[in-house]
């Protein structure tokens, strides 16, 4: 007899209903709905609870049709069955079906009514929920709290306050919800009154008050609450940390982060973001590297802070590492990397990101299209940018401005003007301030002065756009490039606002081109008053002094820079080779692994340049070195190093793309023109101002830059 019992216990396929219900619920929760159904079908004896569990399982796995089919097959139903059907439909967004079931119910209790009210609240139909709520024959704590939360979610704080006062028996959830809602609306003191009235507070209540203070710029009050909390969870610590980060108190956040007993992912992400805002990128990277686990937001945040703080190469390396580790980039991450690719002129990686956006069907979005256009423009692929532009029948202002700016930066003034003229005819978009900056820049770069003057005159009279300093800067730049200094000064004198650094900088740049030293000194004085720490002004004026042999003035400027702790921005150039971006600084190849090969290319180019009649321009070089050293130093400029490395590594016929953070120097411009001819290579150089397309010894700028 005992052995038979043991045998049945071991091998019986029938699971007692209570145990089966638990397992059905568990399997449903972890997504194994088909296994749950097999278990349900294997039960010889099914209770109403078994049927209810299986129906709930289908709803939990977003299978409302299967749930309803099983419900209709139930031999017996109780009110729990009906309530489960109403609640399940609501959770699946099937509001109308839920209401039909509710109306058909043979009997209803407070749970039935509450389920329907909660469903309407959950689906954003608070007005309908409110109407039902007041019709309820009876209400319990849950009913009141559900309606309260509905008002709060809908931003109806005053209605929530009135309802809160009517609740006969306020529980912890209702009070905490009210605290959260008031804090969200900035009514922190009222929230604190409710908090102080509570005889018992859960850790959630304490944390809600801490969060509320933090979100309302009262982080010191948040800390006082935090310090007296009877217990703290990971969420409590994280809320306090985020309060510090959101209020820019990064040092306090660092101190708190160090003593946190557990550092959850969300806390680490907040710390990375905070350190990034402060520019502490190395510290942020250490936090990221120390994380035992990371989520999508971790990668997104660390990539974003590197991109925003000018560490584009590191951001790109992180993106590559992310993909190697099998993490799929989120949409914001892809957008950040597109900006990185644009900054670095990394066409290969930009195309990869474009492909990912296409696979996810994000490329149909107008915003994404404008970001892609910008990336291709800055990588020198203007044709691909125009293809994206033409693909959209309905274009927003950003797309129009992007393509006009693209033509401007490539020196294609006529094409830019053509698009500008098409814009009003499209009927949907009117030119704005940015449009005119782009169009006037196009005229300036292309030397189309008369056309630029006409567009400037039409801004306010035809399009109703009042000139701002950016437009004046474009006009001064355009007139100055053309050598029309009197008109440029008249333009400045006519300004209704105070000229800014962009205006004086435009005129100073023109002075360099036309060797107008007297005007340059006047402009530099104005610029130093506005931006005393900007090294560009000192360097440009110093170069002009050097070109005229005024070495005493050069020394005086150097002394002034030293006194004011002004440091020259180092020139840096990038080129993409074998799907990797390589950076070069002036003279900076001593530590390069391919130093010898690069030096050989430089020597070869030096010989070819001399044979082609190249005459080095040493006019801006320092006077305290001999002529041979001056000439030798020129070939180690960052843009020359990048071109040399690209020639070394890229196959014949492949265009060379180089990006420089500063304006290309006149000597390198001349040298690269000749290199493009003697090496029969197209070289695309993007400097701080514009693109230079070198081909067969000519530049697209026509030496008008």
UniProtKB/Swiss-Prot annotation:
Give me the Gene Ontology terms describing cellular component: mitochondrion
Q: Where is the transit peptide?
A: 1-11
- Judging by the UniProt lineage, the source's domain of life is Eukaryota
Record bears the keyword Zinc-finger: no
Listed InterPro entries: DYW_dom (IPR032867), E_motif (IPR046848), Pentatricopeptide_rpt (IPR002885), PPR_At4g14850-like_plant (IPR046960), TPR-like_helical_dom_sf (IPR011990)
Chief localization: mitochondrion
Type DYW motif: annotated segments: 611-705
Specify where the region named Type E motif lies, as residue ranges.
503-578
PPR repeats at which positions?
16-46, 47-77, 78-112, 113-139, 140-170, 171-205, 206-232, 233-267, 268-294, 295-329, 330-364, 365-395, 396-430, 432-462, 468-498
Q: Name one GO biological process term.
A: RNA modification
Which residues constitute the signal peptide according to the record? none
Its Gene Ontology molecular function terms? RNA binding; zinc ion binding
Q: From the Swiss-Prot or TrEMBL record, state where the protein is found.
A: Mitochondrion
Q: Could you list this entry's UniProt keywords, alphabetically sorted.
A: Mitochondrion, Repeat, Transit peptide
- Sequence segments annotated as region (Type E(+) motif): 579-610
In terms of SUPFAM superfamilies, this protein maps to:
TPR-like
What's this protein's family per the entry?
Answer: Belongs to the PPR family. PCMP-H subfamily.
Protein name as annotated? Pentatricopeptide repeat-containing protein At1g09410, mitochondrial
Q: Which organism is it from?
A: Arabidopsis thaliana (Mouse-ear cress)
């Amino acid at each position: 007899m005992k052995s038979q019992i043991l045998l049945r216990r071991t091998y019986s396929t029938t699971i007692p209903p209570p145990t089966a219900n638990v397992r059905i619920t568990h399997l449903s929760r972890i997504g194994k709905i088909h296994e749950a159904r097999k278990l349900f079908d294997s039960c010889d004896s099914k209770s109403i609870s078994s049927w209810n569990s299986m129906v709930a399982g289908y709803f939990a796995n977003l299978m409302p049709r299967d749930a309803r089919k099983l419900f209709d097959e139930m031999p017996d139903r109780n009110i729990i069955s009906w309530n489960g059907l109403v609640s399940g439909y609501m959770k699946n967004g099937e509001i109308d079906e839920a209401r039909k079931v509710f109306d058909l119910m043979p009997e209803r209790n407070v749970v039935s009514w509450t389920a329907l009210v909660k469903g309407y609240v959950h689906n954003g139909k608070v007005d309908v929920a409110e109407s039902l709520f007041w019709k309820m024959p009876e209400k319990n704590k849950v009913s009141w709290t559900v309606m309260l939360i509905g008002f709060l979610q809908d931003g109806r704080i005053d209605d929530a306050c009135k309802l809160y006062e009517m609740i006969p028996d306020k529980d912890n959830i209702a009070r905490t919800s009210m605290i959260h809602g008031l804090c969200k609306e900035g009514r922190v003191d009222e929230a604190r009154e409710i908090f102080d009235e509570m005889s018992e507070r859960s850790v959630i209540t304490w944390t809600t008050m801490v969060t509320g203070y933090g979100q309302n710029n009262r982080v010191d009050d948040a800390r006082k609450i935090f310090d007296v909390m009877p217990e703290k969870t990971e969420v409590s610590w994280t809320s306090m940390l985020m309060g510090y980060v959101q209020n820019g108190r990064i040092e306090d956040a660092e101190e708190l982060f160090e003593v946190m007993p557990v550092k959850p992912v969300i806390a680490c992400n907040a710390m990375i973001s905070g350190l990034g805002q402060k520019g502490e990128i190395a510290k942020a990277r250490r936090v990221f590297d120390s994380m035992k686990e990371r989520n999508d937001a971790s990668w997104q945040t660390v990539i974003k802070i590197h991109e925003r703080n000018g560490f584009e190469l590191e951001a790109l390396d992180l993106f590559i590492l992310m993909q190697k580790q099998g993490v799929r980039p989120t949409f914001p991450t892809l957008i950040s990397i597109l900006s990185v690719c644009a900054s670095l002129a990394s066409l290969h990686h930009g195309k990869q990101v474009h492909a990912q956006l296409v696979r996810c069907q994000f490329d149909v979005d107008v915003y994404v299209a404008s970001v892609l256009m910008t990336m291709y423009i800055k990588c020198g692929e203007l044709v691909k940018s125009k293809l994206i532009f033409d693909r959209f029948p309905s274009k927003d202002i950003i797309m129009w401005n992007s393509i006009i700016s693209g033509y401007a930066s490539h020196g294609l003034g006529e094409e830019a003007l053509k698009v500008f003229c098409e814009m009003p005819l499209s009927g949907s978009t009117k030119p704005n301030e940015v449009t005119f900056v782009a169009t006037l820049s196009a005229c300036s770069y292309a030397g189309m002065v008369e056309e630029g003057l006409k567009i400037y005159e039409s801004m306010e009279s035809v399009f109703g756009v009042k000139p701002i300093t950016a437009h004046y800067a474009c006009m001064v730049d355009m007139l100055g490039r053309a050598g029309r200094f009197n008109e440029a000064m008249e333009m400045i004198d006519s300004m209704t606002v105070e000229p800014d650094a962009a205006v004086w900088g435009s005129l100073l740049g023109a002075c360099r081109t036309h060797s107008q030293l007297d005007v340059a000194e006047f402009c530099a004085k104005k610029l130093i008053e506005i931006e005393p720490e900007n090294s560009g002004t000192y360097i440009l004026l110093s170069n002009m002094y050097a070109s005229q042999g005024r070495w005493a003035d050069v020394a005086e400027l150097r002394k002034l820079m030293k006194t004011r702790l002004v440091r020259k921005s180092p020139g840096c150039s990038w080129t993409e080779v074998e799907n990797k971006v390589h950076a070069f600084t002036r003279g900076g190849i001593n530590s390069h692994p391919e130093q010898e090969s690069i030096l050989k290319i430089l020597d070869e180019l030096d010989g070819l340049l001399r044979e082609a009649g190249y005459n080095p321009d040493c006019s801006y070089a320092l006077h305290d070195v001999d002529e041979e050293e001056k000439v030798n130093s020129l070939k180690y400029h960052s843009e020359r190093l990048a071109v040399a490395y690209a020639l070394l590594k890229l196959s014949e016929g492949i265009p060379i793309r180089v990006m420089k953070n500063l304006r290309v120097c006149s000597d390198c411009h001349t040298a690269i023109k000749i290199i493009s001819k003697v090496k029969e290579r197209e070289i695309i150089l993007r400097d701080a101002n514009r693109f230079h397309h070198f081909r067969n010894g000519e530049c697209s700028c026509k030496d008008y830059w």
